[in-house]
């Protein structure tokens, strides 16, 4: 099936037909589309959003060329197009798939993601795409592209897309064209000085000779005032007042939302500070407990060393006593209480048996 490349996110109205009819349609999960780093370097584990940036990064590593060289199979990869995982989205249809991975990720973040990672410090507006946030910073504080509902857009394509769906747009006055025609109709008779227009006013009187044409035109206020233009002027005045009220109300609503957002941000910052202080106190208590346990461990270690020294001295005394014993009956008497202690029985019995053997030999 032959696929066509849809309208891009930057508002390009020209769709281009894919030259490769065997393009592979790829449908990524929302979790994959929300990942910030899609391509990871296998040497230093650094992530990149584009494959081109990863290839340029690999050149910085001083590794043999064989590791950077691609196989022929990798070069003959089919072209891929990406569809949106949302079933109700236009780009979910393969005929409207996007031909760039970065484009589909920006589209999903911009249209279907709720998490606004980048927030403007001046107006507290959040953006899910970093490029949109940077474009907003360039025009934040200026008028930019303002809609009749009070919203201001930094991108032309976003402003046009909003106007297609905005329901608070200012209605065009229907009598504006009639007002222009009426004004033109008032100006048209002023350019002529024919006396025919005064015929009904001079009924029953002899006609006067028309005055000689002169190069100077009479001023516009010399003609009689037409009362029919008054309703149009009042209508235009009412429309201007209505537009001013709508814009003022929109600005008031925007200021109120900004103040509420700032209050919520301050409350969250206060809670975060309290949590940080509590964590700091817990860390200090844990450090004190650790120092106490460390001191107790050192004391126990010292006591254990002293016990080892006492044990060594006792063993030395036992050995010296065994060497002094020469009577066989005394050895038997000394052997009875020693066997009661199971911890030193093996050591004492070895010395007793050796001493007994030496006495019998003598």
Curated annotation (Swiss-Prot):
Q: Which residues form a coiled coil?
A: 252-319
Q: Where is the composition biased (Basic and acidic residues)?
A: 251-278
Cellular localisation = Nucleus
Q: Which Gene3D superfamilies match?
A: Classic Zinc Finger (3.30.160.60)
Xref: InterPro entries: C2CH-3rd_BIRD-IDD (IPR055187), C2H2-2nd_BIRD-IDD (IPR055186), IDD1-16 (IPR031140), Znf_C2H2_sf (IPR036236), Znf_C2H2_type (IPR013087)
Name the source's superkingdom. Answer: Eukaryota
The entry's Zn(2+) 1-binding residues are 120, 123, 136, 140
Output this protein's name: Protein indeterminate-domain 16
Record the organism: Arabidopsis thaliana
State the encoding gene.
IDD16
